């Protein structure tokens, strides 16, 4: 009987080692996905803020160009 238990025990230990390895990889993939999602949200937020600032600057430039074209003073 002892001879039959050794291969079974080895298979059980190997199975647990494989499961632990898979758990480590799964956990790492989840961490990477969480980071990428967070990075995506951060980038989108920053780009939206930058877009708002650029839009405001474009409007100011158009206003100033219109005043210059009409010959108005800027003061």
Swiss-Prot record:
InterPro entries attached to this UniProt entry: BRICK1
Record keywords: Coiled coil, Cytoplasm, Cytoskeleton
Disulfide bonds, paired cysteine numbers: none
One GO-annotated biological process of the protein: regulation of actin polymerization or depolymerization
GO molecular function, one term: protein-containing complex binding
GO CC terms in record: cytoskeleton; SCAR complex
Cellular localization per UniProt: Cytoplasm, Cytoskeleton
Coiled coil regions in record: 41-72
Membrane spanning residue stretches: none
Domain of life: Eukaryota
Family stated for the protein in its record: Belongs to the BRK1 family.
Function: Involved in regulation of actin and microtubule organization. Part of a WAVE complex that activates the Arp2/3 complex.
Protein name: Probable protein BRICK1
Underlying gene: brk1
């Amino acid at each position: 009987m002892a001879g039959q238990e050794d291969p079974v025990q080895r298979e059980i230990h190997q199975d647990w080692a494989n499961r632990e390895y898979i758990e480590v990889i799964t956990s790492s993939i989840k961490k990477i996905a969480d980071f990428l999602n967070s990075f995506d949200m951060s980038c989108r937020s920053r780009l939206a803020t930058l877009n708002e600032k650029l839009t405001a600057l474009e409007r100011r430039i158009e206003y100033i160009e219109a005043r210059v074209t009409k010959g108005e003073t800027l003061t």
